[in-house]
């Protein structure tokens, strides 16, 4: 365990630095999700690696016998967490965790959700709106684009109350959002 007052890396870098296929796929994901750099991608890969490692360990324990006691509790907690973040469907089991891809984690970032909900035209613009304080969840300003959004929070993502983006005449506001505000 690391010293509590010291920051430690929350990601692992690739094993080999120059693999053309891996680098090309990373660039595509960085562009698609509007990430600032590959470090953000590596963080999501590390989160996914941790989930899958826990699932593998629990499946190995269940191979000896059915999940009982602490193992069953831990498996239920892992599934509950992944279902709460909408990474897995509600009828999923521990085997489904092994089939997860990086995109499942990246889709749950606040930056991606703002773009998917139509509050921004592009993923990069969504990142800018978040860092500039134009986005709120449950009325509270959020300025972290990499925040993982739960299913409940997803319903409450909106423009911050005092943000100039709340005005339908703002030039950077997407047209469909402005039209829905005028109708209300």
From Swiss-Prot:
InterPro entries: Ribosomal_uS4, Ribosomal_uS4_arc, Ribosomal_uS4_CS, Ribosomal_uS4_euk/arc, Ribosomal_uS4_N, S4_RNA-bd, S4_RNA-bd_sf
Domain of life: Archaea
A GO cellular-component term linked to this record: small ribosomal subunit
Keyword terms, alphabetized: Ribonucleoprotein, Ribosomal protein, RNA-binding, rRNA-binding
Keyword Isomerase appears in the UniProt entry: no
Segments for region (Disordered): 163-184
Gene Ontology MF, one: rRNA binding
Keyword Ribonucleoprotein included in the entry's annotation: yes
Domain annotation S4 RNA-binding: ranges: 108-172
GO process terms (BP): ribosomal small subunit biogenesis; translation
Protein's job: One of the primary rRNA binding proteins, it binds directly to 16S rRNA where it nucleates assembly of the body of the 30S subunit. With S5 and S12 plays an important role in translational accuracy.
Family as reported in the entry's similarity comment: Belongs to the universal ribosomal protein uS4 family.
Summary of subunit composition and partner proteins: Part of the 30S ribosomal subunit. Contacts protein S5. The interaction surface between S4 and S5 is involved in control of translational fidelity.
Protein name, entry field: Small ribosomal subunit protein uS4
UniProt source species: Methanococcoides burtonii (strain DSM 6242 / NBRC 107633 / OCM 468 / ACE-M)
């Amino acid at each position: 365990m690391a010293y509590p007052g010291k920051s430690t890396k929350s990601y692992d870098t690739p094993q080999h630095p120059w693999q053309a296929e891996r680098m090309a796929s990373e660039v595509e994901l960085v562009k698609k999700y509007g990430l600032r750099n590959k470090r953000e991608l590596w963080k999501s890969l590390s989160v996914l690696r941790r989930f899958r490692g826990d699932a593998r360990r629990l499946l190995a324990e269940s191979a000896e016998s059915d999940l009982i006691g602490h193992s069953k509790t831990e498996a239920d907690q892992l599934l509950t967490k992944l279902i709460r973040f909408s990474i897995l469907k509600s009828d999923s089991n521990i085997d489904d965790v092994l089939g997860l891809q990086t995109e499942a984690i990246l889709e749950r970032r606040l930056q991606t959700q703002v773009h998917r909900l139509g509050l921004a035209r592009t993923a990069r613009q969504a990142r800018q709106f978040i860092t500039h304080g134009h986005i709120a969840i449950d009325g509270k300003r959020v300025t972290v684009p990499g925040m993982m959004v739960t299913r409940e929070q997803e319903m409450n993502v909106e423009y911050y109350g005092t943000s100039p983006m709340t005005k339908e005449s703002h030039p950077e506001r997407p047209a469909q959002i402005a039209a829905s505000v005028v109708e209300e």
